[in-house]
Regions:
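Classical Sec-dependent N-terminal signal peptides that target proteins to the secretory pathway
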Residues: 4-24
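Extracytoplasmic "Venus flytrap"
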Residues: 31-49, 58, 68-70
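Short beta->alpha junction loops
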Residues: 65-76, 80, 130-131, 156
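Immediate post-signal peptide segment of exported/extracytoplasmic ligand-binding proteins
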Residues: 23-30, 61, 145-148
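Short, well-structured alpha-helical segments in soluble
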Residues: 74-90, 142-143
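Extracytoplasmic ligand/sensor domains, especially the bilobed periplasmic-binding protein
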Residues: 91-155, 160-168
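Short, solvent-exposed amphipathic alpha-helices that sit
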Residues: 42-58, 76, 136-139, 160-169
Length: 169
């Protein structure tokens, strides 16, 4: 998980390089909305620590991560994101859970890099950074072709992942 955060942060920083803000004295502030309280607070704590490690590796004082607590629910994810937006933050890493992205289209000036692996039904301003069903099936297909496997059986569970898997196939 730590390497995923490093890659995401480096990608964000590279995307920001061409902007004039990089050459300004101002800090580049990036939001981080994760569950900091409640049942999933250990996940949020781990993400905060991973992000700090990535920032230490980058070793540039211009970047600042500003956390917000989603409490692992969509209403608090929107509240935390709105609070970050009100501080002028327009790039936010998170939320972790797909359900928490439900109302984020209300902040259409903000780009979210969500840690969820679901891509079906996300708001247009949410980019999923997790490993999704499409990339998994592309890997399976590549393996099949390399090993000349002719037939494959796929069992799809009756769950909220069903539509995602059907789209990937």
């Amino acid at each position: 998980m730590k390497s995923l955060f490093k890659k995401i942060l480096i990608l964000i920083f590279i995307c920001l390089l061409p902007t004039s803000k990089i050459f300004a004295e101002d800090k580049i502030r990036i939001g981080l909305v994760v569950p900091l309280t409640g049942e999933y607070s250990t996940i949020g704590d781990s993400i905060i620590k991973s992000t700090r490690l990535a920032l230490n590796k980058i070793n540039d004082e211009k970047f600042e991560i500003v956390p917000g607590d989603t409490k692992a629910n969509p209403i608090d994810a929107l509240k935390a994101s709105k609070a970050l937006y009100d501080q002028g933050i327009k790039i936010i890493i998170g939320p972790v859970f797909n359900e928490s992205t439900k109302y984020l289209d209300e902040l259409n000036d903000v780009t979210f890099i969500s840690l969820t692996n679901k891509i079906y039904g996300n708001p247009p301003n949410v980019i999923s950074a997790g490993v999704n069903a499409i990339s998994q099936f592309q890997t399976i297909d590549k393996f099949r072709n390399l090993n000349e496997i002719q037939r494959t059986i796929i069992l799809i569970p009756k769950s909220d992942y069903r539509k995602e898997i059907e789209l990937a196939i």
